[in-house]
Amino acid sequence: MSSTEEKFSLKEVLVSFKACLIDDDKDVILEHYVNGWKGLVRFMSSLGTIFSFVSKDAVSKIQIMESYLAGPNGERYRTLQSMVEYELSSDLVDLTKRSDHTDSGCRTLLRLHRALRWLQLFLEKLRVSNEDSKTSTLCTEAYNDSLANFHPWIVRKAATVSFIALPYRNTFFEIMNVGTTEEVVAMLGESMPYVTKVYDFTQEVYSQHNLLELP
Ligand code: 1Q0
């Protein structure tokens, strides 16, 4: 294990979502947003190969976003607002049916954005849970109230079956590498408001531009 992996803690990942917010919480820096997701996927990998079908999809979406960020128009992808303005004004988004721009930044980020809602619900449930709470139940409830609404039956089935393999709450908290249960709860209480702000702001921008149903 490398030294960076040893130090890996969920707190550092959630801090990326704090670093996202600029201009009085009126914009989101995409580089930090993507880094937050990279950290989350790394965390998910430590839960075992059962989630590899999830991480594969998440990694491919992260890579799409990274290629835009590092590409010739990278500056246009610096923030959420600049990406939306650039892609819409340059006709780079398939609005009703996937055709010429199957992997626009807008549709790719929308998938991550929907997953962020799951994360928000799941972590909040974990924060207020007690020792007897089952992580698989919390995760399933969070999923059913968010991402599941956008997934076909077969994906929902695969996802809910994989949740059964989630470790107990204590093990989960240990993997987070934050400290005692009290410290985990405090850390979640401190960082979740930033995740919520990022989620709410993204939702607002997508809603304003009618982008919430991108194919
Ligand atoms: C901790 C357990 C992880 C459970 C992850 C829950 C999400 C289930 C999602 C199932 C996704 C199935 C794969 C494919 C889906 C795609 O069809 C779909 C749509 O994309 P497209 O291109 O076909 O239109 N993709 C998505 O919906 C994106 C899904 C991304 C999910 C990313 C999840 C990353 C998870 C990180 C785990 C963080 C753990 C947090 C720490 C917990 C602390 C205790």
UniProtKB/Swiss-Prot annotation:
Protein name listed in UniProt: Ceramide-1-phosphate transfer protein
Protein topology in the membrane: Peripheral membrane protein
PANTHER family: CERAMIDE-1-PHOSPHATE TRANSFER PROTEIN (PTHR10219:SF20), GLYCOLIPID TRANSFER PROTEIN-RELATED (PTHR10219)
SUPFAM superfamilies registered for this protein in UniProt: Glycolipid transfer protein, GLTP (SSF110004)
InterPro entries noted in UniProt: GLTP_sf, Glycolipid_transfer_prot_dom
Gene this chain is encoded by: cptp
Catalytic activity: N-(hexadecanoyl)-sphing-4-enine-1-phosphate(in) = N-(hexadecanoyl)-sphing-4-enine-1-phosphate(out); N-(9Z-octadecenoyl)-sphing-4-enine-1-phosphate(in) = N-(9Z-octadecenoyl)-sphing-4-enine-1-phosphate(out)
Cited function: Mediates the intracellular transfer of ceramide-1-phosphate (C1P) between organelle membranes and the cell membrane. Required for normal structure of the Golgi stacks. Can bind phosphoceramides with a variety of aliphatic chains, but has a preference for lipids with saturated C16:0 or monounsaturated C18:1 aliphatic chains, and is inefficient with phosphoceramides containing lignoceryl (C24:0). Plays a role in the regulation of the cellular levels of ceramide-1-phosphate, and thereby contributes to the regulation of phospholipase PLA2G4A activity and the release of arachidonic acid.
Residues involved in an N-acylsphingoid base 1-phosphate binding: 57, 61, 107, 111, 151
Organism, scientific name: Xenopus laevis (African clawed frog)
GO cellular component: cytosol; endosome membrane; Golgi apparatus; nuclear outer membrane; plasma membrane
Family the UniProt entry places it in: Belongs to the GLTP family.
